[in-house]
Amino acid sequence: MLKLTPRQAEILAFIKRCLEDNGYPPTRAEIAQELGFKSPNAAEEHLKALARKGAIEMTPGASRGIRIPGFEPGAANEDEGLPVIGRVAAGAPILAQQHVEESCQINPAFFHPKADYLLRVRGMSMKDIGIFDGDLLAVHTTREARNGQIVVARLDDEVTVKRFKREGNKVWLIAENPEFAPIEVDLEQQDLVIEGLSVGVIRR
């Protein structure tokens, strides 16, 4: 398989996640919504590029006609463990290869919902709920979050772990340490992306 761009790798990871979680691949519209494309046509162009590189196979005329050669949901991830993500570069996808420090041999299904990666925690802003500097945070990738959940959020290209609270167009990213003030986000003026939910912590 030819080398993928960061965006192509992100799409491939989303397809695998849908196969793992649902048993079937996403539609073009679902890919466009997940990745923030303006239309399914943009997703189609990326899928064609992935097919040219041998990463996927496409069935013409089928909305979910995407398969990954040799990919068996559940089998590969359990053998390979979970990628450990270190410092995330501004603007780059979290699962971009340059962020992967190592692999941790733990079954993703140990967590619920299933973990997609482990994020190395930086700092002590969440210490009051037992998340410390250097811990590995198990993260389930999703763009949705409910009030009170612990999220991995990307704000103006910086990735942070905080408790999520939303009221209308305002979001607060709240630390679990009184030394850190809540981060107030105006969704009409700032770019906030939910990268995933905390589903567990590993201390080494």
Swiss-Prot record:
Gene Ontology MF terms: DNA binding; serine-type endopeptidase activity
UniProt-listed Enzyme Commission number(s): 3.4.21.88
Pfam families (UniProt xref): LexA_DNA_bind, Peptidase_S24
Enzymatic reactions: Hydrolysis of Ala-|-Gly bond in repressor LexA
DNA-binding region: 28-48
Top-level taxon of origin: Bacteria
Active site: 125, 162
Record has Transmembrane helix as a keyword: no
InterPro entries registered for this protein in UniProt: LexA, LexA-like, LexA/Signal_pep-like_sf, LexA_DNA-bd_dom, LexA_repressor, Peptidase_S24_LexA, Peptidase_S24_S26A/B/C, WH-like_DNA-bd_sf
Keywords in alphabetical order: Autocatalytic cleavage, DNA damage, DNA repair, DNA replication, DNA-binding, Hydrolase, Repressor, SOS response, Transcription, Transcription regulation
GO biological process: DNA repair; DNA replication; negative regulation of DNA-templated transcription; proteolysis; SOS response
Site (Cleavage): 90-91
Subunit structure: Homodimer.
Family that this chain belongs to: Belongs to the peptidase S24 family.
Purpose: Represses a number of genes involved in the response to DNA damage (SOS response), including recA and lexA. In the presence of single-stranded DNA, RecA interacts with LexA causing an autocatalytic cleavage which disrupts the DNA-binding part of LexA, leading to derepression of the SOS regulon and eventually DNA repair.
Protein name: LexA repressor
